[in-house]
Structures are given as C-alpha cells and as structure tokens.
A protein has these predicted regions:
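Ligand-binding face of N-terminal immunoglobulin V-set domains in extracellular IgSF glycoproteins
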Residues: 251
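A conserved active-site cap/scaffold subdomain adjacent to cofactor or substrate pockets
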Residues: 211, 255-257
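Short coil/turn connectors at secondary-structure junctions
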Residues: 130, 146-149
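Acidic-aromatic/histidine active-site loop/patch
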Residues: 148-205, 209-215
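N-terminal processing/targeting junctions
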Residues: 8, 15, 178, 182-184, ...
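Fungal secretory targeting signals
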Residues: 1-17
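Histidine- and aromatic-enriched segments that form or immediately flank copper-ligand environments
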Residues: 20-142, 217-246
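Exposed beta-strand face motif in extracellular beta-rich ectodomains
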Residues: 115-117, 206, 254
Length: 257
C-alpha cells in the first residue's frame, strides 16, 4: 500500500510538471534606455530589453537559443544550483563551449528552486551590452501573502560597448586596475530623464522583486514615506523583517512587501 501511494504521488507530480519553452534569438539591436545615447546592444528576438522568464517549481525551463552575434555566447541562470545539470550552467569554457555564431543550443533546466533570479550571457563581458533578464521561479504554494507581484530591475549602464571597456580595463595604461565607471543607472530598464512608474492601489499588498543586474554598481533602494518588509533574499524565503531601505550588491536579489 505504501509503495502504491508513493507511486501515485510521483505520477501526480509528473502529471502537473511541464516544459516551459522560450525561443531566444540573440542578436544586435540598437537601444537608448537612458535617453543619452543610442548604441548597439544585445537583445533577444530583435528587441531590447529581453523579456522576463517565468517558470514554476517542478517544471523544466527550456530555452531554444540561436546565436546571431559575430562572437560566441552562452547563457547562465544566476543563482540556480544546477544539480546534475552543470553542463547547462553557462560559464564559457568552464561548463560548456560557446554557442558559435550562427549556432544553436537548447538549455533544459529542471526547476527545483523558487524565488527571484536572473539570466545573462556568460561569454567575456557580454552581458554589459544588455543581454540580461529577470528569471522568476514561482512557488505554487507561496508562503507569503500579497495581491500583486512586481519585478523591478536595477542596473548600471555604459555608453561604450563591453569589448572596448574590457580592453581598456586590461590595458597596460590602467596599471591600477581601475574598473570602468558607468555612465548612469537604469531602474525598470529606463534611466536619464525617463522615470519608471509603479502604480499602487491603496489597501493592496505588493511584492516587489528587486534584482541588481549591474556590472559594477551597488544600489540602495527605498520608498519615501514607507517601510518595507523583506521576505526573500537571493532565492531563499525569510521571516518577514521590516526595513527602511535595502542594499543590493551586484547580482543580489531581494523581495519586499
């Protein structure tokens, strides 16, 4: 009877799990997110910014990837364990060869975690050119109570391309190893004179998923006149903790209510 019950549970879990498939054609586009300079960036399917990816616990994230760049590329799901699937982790020449120009690769990642993550290129300094996007792993049995779910990205932005920035950083003319200073910051993928707007309805509780997708910069986040409650840090649910502001270093994620 016990084995029949366990088998039934396994079949039930298998029945609800599914493949969630995205098609990413990675290529060059032009964008001007801070309103200061239009330049070549790396987008997906002919647009920038790349759209967020959403998948649920026990599903499998599938990314059908085509490289339309003139250099290799890879994709890395930041913060994911990749237990048994390290060959899908993405670091160039560490866990995989690069996807060559004109080449294709299918990433298949079983989802055994929940929370807030992000995905980015992991070849050279490529993600500085914009190939980065939120990756949200939903929990069907979400322990925290809220009415709406909002993703808010924070990132620095350079007017020079990643290849030139990396060349200058590694140059003998930079003996102190000074890192390139960004030209500005983007909140919600916009910056400069354009402000990202969040619309709230009084009486509703909002989960804001903060993701620092920068190359260099730390962000201090606060909402004037409001306290916030931290409920998740780097994909790990926490007991609610009231704070006045949140500090996020590069690659960190925090959810607040």
């Amino acid at each position: 009877m016990l084995f029949k019950s366990l088998a039934g549970l396994a079949l039930a879990a298998a029945a609800v799990a599914k493949d969630v498939t995205y098609y990413w054609d990675i290529g060059y586009v032009t964008a001007n997110p801070d309103g200061k300079l239009e330049r070549q960036v790396i987008g997906v399917n002919g647009v920038w910014p790349p759209p967020p990816l959403h998948v649920s616990l026990n599903d499998t994230l599938v990314i059908e990837t085509r490289n339309s760049l003139d250099t290799p590329t890879t994709l890395h799901a930041h913060g994911m364990y990749q237990n048994g699937t390290n060959y899908m982790d993405g670091p160039y020449m560490v866990t995989q060869c690069g996807i060559p120009p004109g080449g294709n690769m299918t990433y298949r990642i079983p989802i055994i975690q929940t929370g807030t993550y992000w995905i980015h290129a992991h070849f050279s300094a490529q993600y500085v050119d914009g190939i980065r996007a939120p990756l949200i792993l939903h929990n069907p049995e979400e322990p925290h109570k809220y009415d709406e779910d909002v993703v808010l990205t924070l990132e620095d932005w350079y007017h020079d391309g990643a290849a030139g920035l990396l060349k200058d950083f590694l140059s003998w003319k930079n003996p102190g190893g000074a890192e390139p200073v960004p030209n500005g910051a983007l909140i919600g993928r916009v910056g400069g004179d354009e402000l990202y707007k969040l619309k709230f309805t009084p009486g509703k509780t909002y989960r804001i998923r903060l993701i620092n997708m920068s190359a260099l910069s730390m962000f201090h986040f606060s909402i004037e006149g409001h306290k916030m409650r931290v409920i998740e840090v780097d994909g790990v649910d926490t007991e609610e903790q009231e704070v006045g502001n949140v500090i996020l270093s590069v690659a960190q994620r925090t959810s607040i209510l």
